[in-house]
Each structure stands twice: as structure tokens, then as C-alpha cells.
Amino acid sequence: VIPVWILDEVVEGHGACPKWRLGLAVSHFADVLADKGSRLTLRRGKAVEVLCGLVRETGAGAVYWTRLYDPESVERDTAVKAALKGDGIEARSFAGHVLFEPWTVETKTGGFYKVYTPFWKSLKDSAVPAALPAPTTLRAPDTWPDSDRIEDWDMGAAMQRGAEIVLPFVNVGEAAAQGRLGAFIGEGISGYEAARDRPAANGTSKLSENLTHGEISARTCWHAGMRALHEGKQGAETFLKELVWREFGYHLVYHTPVITTGNWREEWDAFPWNTEDTPQVTAWKQGRTGVEFVDAAMREMYVTGHMHNRARMIVASYLTKHLLSHWKIGQQWFADCLIDWDAASNALGWQWSAGSGPDATPYFRVFNPLTQLDKFDRDRAYVDRWIAEGRARPHRDALAYFQAVPRAWGLSPQDRYPEPVVDVAEGRQRALSAYENR
């Protein structure tokens, strides 16, 4: 068996933080294989050309891989399979990234699901196969093919000085992911339903980065959640619902791939969203809108590569509604800054917030970041952790933000905290007027 990983055209297009985090995952996986007496062969180039070349070099008779469902990956995998089969090579892909293949889940009329709740109800009692255990050893070939060095790829180049800031918040590898899952099921899941909406609480599983990079299987998480449910642990069903929300994203991106690039609801194509990097958009990206909940969330993402889910909803609503800026601006910024970036989940989340997606929040639901702060961060622990300006003794994580951002931004913790770029009440009314007149 010759394990191979290819830095191909799809991965080359990843944003700074996801690409860097993927490099960590690949490097760690290479170490795991080495411990099993194997090697990870690294190549760079177009997947179909690299694989066909490796087959010729090694005399391999079969190529196997795990399926993905975003449009670019589907196109790539289709081309690879056709080329290999054309050369008489067995080419097979397998389902390992999701609980159910998107085409196996159908409505009663044979279509695909467009609303989450019936999608959840159709799956919650379905049998999910258990994840296969990792092999203890892999039979090595007589001769190993040449391999690139991952250090030469410099997958973290675009991170600049931010990499050393984000690194302590990363949890790399299967063993670490399994440990995180075990701790969550054993200690955290009972309080999950209540704590998951409070960004200052350590109330979520934090498994999203590991799921994204294949370091733990959704099936493994599902079976752990089901065991917790059968043991009567409060919060277990909510955890399972979140896994199915991830599944819903893949279901939609497969059946309607436009969701990653354009409005899922075509009637939103004429909506007058701003599409430029205006000063207000720049303030949003930099966490300097003058709205503490929004700014804390954006800074959390820049320092840790994570953002709490409640905070994601608030910053997305603020950008698309209070600032009337296109959701694709936010989608692209998240794609550059998140270590758990996932094309399907990212697109679904942004279009849900903007109102342009399937099962989206109604246009008149405009999150008020001030009342959200009172509700979910009443003691201000979250904003105090991430905002340094005006604090006599700023939290170290708030100060880390100024060490992580590009020097060209010219930011300092001694700066005055900015005034709001838009009045919250006026921004809400402007959004409602625009939606009602669209």
C-alpha cells in the first residue's frame, strides 16, 4: 500500500488559515504512518496527472480514495476516475466524510431536502455504519516512489506572523480528536444544550476542525452521541442535530452546487447588497465596528482560527443586514481565517444568515448585537477576553490580536476603541426597508 497526498489545484486555492491547518494535518498524518512502518508520498500538481504518473511509476493496479461533495472535488474526482479506468486501473472512491451519501437521502416524492427539520427527522432513527478501525500496520512496497517535502511547500506562507499566534489553539491529529470527543461526551455534553449559546463558556465539542480535516469520522461522533443519548445525557440529541446540520450542508452542496457561489434563492440576485470593501466592511474584517460583540468575535477568529457559533450568526447578520453587504464578502473572509473552514457549512451558514439560502432566517429577523450581548454574555467575559482598548489590564488573548494582525493595519492596543460605524437601530431599519422594497 502506497499512501499518497496531493497538493492539487483545489487545495492550492484554499485561504491562508485553512491551508496552513491542512498542512499541519498532513504532516501529522505522515508521522502516524511512519510509526506504522509506512510512508506518506507527497506530490504537487493536477490530481489526474499526478495519480496517472504514480501508477506508471509503481505499477499499481488500483487507486482508492474518500469522496468529497463540493463542485470542485466532484469534477476532479470524476476526471481522475475516468482517466484511471481508461488506462485499465481499478479506481474506487468510498464514503467516509459524511454519515449518508447525499443521493441516498430522499423526500417521499424522490427529491432532495431543502428544509432542515424534515431532513433531521428522516435521519435521526437511521442506522449509521460504525467507522472502521485504523489498520495496525500497512504492507510496504519493495521500492518507495519519490516524495516531495512538505516543508518545501510552505503551506503556511500566507499566515505570516499569525501562525505562531494561532498554533496553541489548534488540536491536530486523530488521537487528539478522539481525546477531545471523549472529554466532551464524558463531561461536556450534559451541559451542552445550555452552554453552547454562551461564547465565553467552554460548552462546545470543538471538533469542527478535526471533522473538516478528516482527523475524526462523523460516524465516530454520531455513535458516541447515540451512546450518550441512550444513557439519558441531556444535550446528546442537540449534539446529534448539529452533526446532521453539517450533513445537511453536504446534502445541499451536492444537489445544488450553486449554493457555494451564488444566491440559492434566485429572487435575491437583484438585492442591492454592497459588494465592495468599503470602510465599514474593512472595520468588520478588522474587528473595529464599534460593536463589542461583533468585534470580539472577529478578533477571536483572527487569534484562534475558531469562532463560536452564536458569534458567527451575530457577525453574519451584522454584515449582511446592518451593513447591507453581500454574504460572499463574509464567506470569503471566513474562508481565509478559519481553521475549521468547510465549503458546505460555510456557504449554508452565510446564506442562512443573509436570507438567500434554503431554510434561511426570515428577512425581518435582524440580530441585535447589543441585546444578544446582554443575553449571552451578560457578565462581559467574552468581550473582555477579546477587546483590549480601554481596559486597564487587557486579557492576553486581546493583546495577542494586535500581534497576529498584519502590521500594515497599523493597530495598537493603546488605540481608542472606535465609535460604531453604524447606529444599530438605524442599521436595522435600513435593512428592513431594503428587504421590503426588493
Task: Show the residue positions of the predicted features.
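Trp/Phe/Arg-rich N-terminal binding region typifying the photolyase-homology
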Residues: 1-131, 235, 345, 433-438
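Active-site-proximal binding-pocket segments
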Residues: 202-392
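Glycine/tryptophan-enriched, flexible segments
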Residues: 89, 110-268, 376-377, 381-438
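An acidic- and aromatic-residue-enriched active-site/binding cleft used to recognize and process polar
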Residues: 6-8, 45, 68-70, 96-97, ...
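Soluble or luminal CAZymes and related metallo-dependent hydrolases
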Residues: 21, 25, 173, 289, ...
